[in-house]
């Protein structure tokens, strides 16, 4: 099914927990099977107001590991009431010195009721994340960590590779901008597809139309 990602970037007009809560509720009303959101304030509201599973994360910084980068971040995200916590699952150094596997183990010890989504950048990440006990594998970081090219749409080659080894649900995320691309990801083995920008980021959507008109 469809997971709608409701996130706004720092400095943007929609960067407000109440706004993101409304966006998440609107997506759920439209049939989204789940919501992905970031930030403790946003998550605290969204988890109260939607009846679908929420994937929570905490973006801290802009370089290296910044998606729920430490065990402390992960436990705080879990405390907001979300059912799934998303973590950077790459092998890059984490700010607290723990490995991804140690972070998963620590989170599951603290919150055995919460599932872990591994945000992967390549097949090796997915393999290691699955071995570490991740409950969901995501292609979130494909094209952003150096191992994979930045594809025009979702990285279908990586989807095929991960689907072939996955023993847990595979969630395709990253550059899914059309319903056709989402459907293609499902055909290639996705359990669910995350769509963010194309649904919940009007600044970017507007820019697509503006660029198309200017090019004529």
What label would you give each PLM region?
Residues 1-4, 50-63, 103, 108-121, ...:
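Short beta-strand/loop segments at the ligand-binding rim of alpha/beta enzyme cores
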Residues 34-39, 43, 55-57, 83-88, ...:
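Short beta-strand segments at enzyme active-site cores
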């Amino acid at each position: 099914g469809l997971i709608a990602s409701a996130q706004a970037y720092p400095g943007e007009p929609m960067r407000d927990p109440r706004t993101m809560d409304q966006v998440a509720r609107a997506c759920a009303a439209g049939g989204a099977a789940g919501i992905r959101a970031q930030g403790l304030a946003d998550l605290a509201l969204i988890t109260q107001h939607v009846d679908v599973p929420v994937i929570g994360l905490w973006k801290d910084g802009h370089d290296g590991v910044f998606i729920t980068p430490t065990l402390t971040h992960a436990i705080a995200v879990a405390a907001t009431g979300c059912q799934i916590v998303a973590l950077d699952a790459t092998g890059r150094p984490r700010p607290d010195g723990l490995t991804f596997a140690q972070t998963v183990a620590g989170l599951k010890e603290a919150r055995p009721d919460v599932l872990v989504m591994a945000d992967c950048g390549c097949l090796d990440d997915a393999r290691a994340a699955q071995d570490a006990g991740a409950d969901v594998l995501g292609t979130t970081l494909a094209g952003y960590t150096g191992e994979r090219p930045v594809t025009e749409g979702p990285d279908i080659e990586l989807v095929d590779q991960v689907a072939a080894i996955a023993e847990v649900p595979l969630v395709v995320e990253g550059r899914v901008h059309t319903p056709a691309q989402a459907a293609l990801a499902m055909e290639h083995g996705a359990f669910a597809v995350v769509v963010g920008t194309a649904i919940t980021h009007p600044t970017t959507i507007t820019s697509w139309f503006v660029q198309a008109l200017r090019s004529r």
